[in-house]
Curated annotation (Swiss-Prot):
It comes from the Bacteria. The record marks K64, D67 as: Transition state stabilizer. It catalyses: 3-dehydro-L-gulonate 6-phosphate + H(+) = L-xylulose 5-phosphate + CO2. Pathway: Cofactor degradation; L-ascorbate degradation; D-xylulose 5-phosphate from L-ascorbate: step 2/4. Binds 1 Mg(2+) ion per subunit. Induction: Induced by L-ascorbate. Repressed by UlaR. Its cofactor is Mg(2+). This is 3-keto-L-gulonate-6-phosphate decarboxylase UlaD. Belongs to the HPS/KGPDC family. KGPDC subfamily. It comes from Salmonella typhimurium (strain LT2 / SGSC1412 / ATCC 700720). Homodimer. Substrate binds at D11, R192.
């Protein structure tokens, strides 16, 4: 089982605040996510600028595309994104359109499982050639005190068994990682737990050490 990658989510409102994070920890992570908040605040230039600074890193545009899949994904890929996200409630043709464009750029598409979705949809994504999904505990759910539970672990295992590469996100803390041991997680996303740490560098390194211990 290969080691899960570590992704930092830049859900900053401005590039200046995003750079405060990347200057510290870009070299400690595998994937740099231009979060939805930053995508809205700064547009695709955020993707372009971060990829120019860190060409050796995977840069994800978390656009959460809901419609106009080909147009919006092309905007992201032309800005040199490696991956883009499509929201789970989008029509299957939106996901297919985004994937078609991704292939032109040797990129990839992730389905963001935020909110309601069904296993029938999951099978449609697999049939369409989608390989990646993001299992998401929403920011609002976290704020309401909703913790990771057995239902989450069961769903993640089932998605993995279907052949998906599963990314896990949603207020992920270091102490949560053992919950997922034994599952071939593709990526763990840490946002505020790294960005807002007293030492973001040490926080990122602790995540990497824990991943190596649990999956190594």
């Amino acid at each position: 089982m290969s080691l899960p990658m570590l992704q930092v989510a830049l859900d900053n409102q401005t590039m200046d605040s995003a750079y405060e994070t990347t200057r510290l920890i870009a070299e400690e992570v595998d994937i740099i996510e231009v979060g939805t908040i930053l995508c809205v605040g700064e547009g695709v230039r955020a993707v372009r600028d971060l990829k120019a600074l860190y060409p050796h890193k995977i840069v994800l545009a978390d656009a959460k595309i809901a419609d106009a899949g080909k147009i919006l994904s092309r905007m992201c890929f032309e800005a040199n994104a490696d991956w883009v996200t499509v929201i789970c409630c989008a029509d299957i043709n939106t996901a297919k359109g985004a994937l078609d464009v991704a292939k032109e750029f040797n990129g990839d598409v992730q389905i963001e499982l935020t909110g309601y979705w069904t296993w029938e949809q999951a099978q449609q994504w697999r049939d369409a050639g989608i390989q990646q999904v993001v299992y998401h505990r929403s920011r609002d759910a976290q704020a309401a005190g909703v913790a990771w539970g057995e239902a989450d672990i069961t769903a993640i295992k089932r998605l993995s068994d279907m052949g998906f590469k599963v990314t896990v996100t949603g207020g992920l803390a270091l102490e949560d990682l053992p919950l997922f041991k034994g599952i071939p997680i593709h990526v763990f996303i840490a946002g505020r737990s790294i960005r807002d740490a007293e030492s973001p560098v040490e926080a990122a390194r602790q995540f990497k050490r824990s991943i190596a211990q649990l999956w190594g």
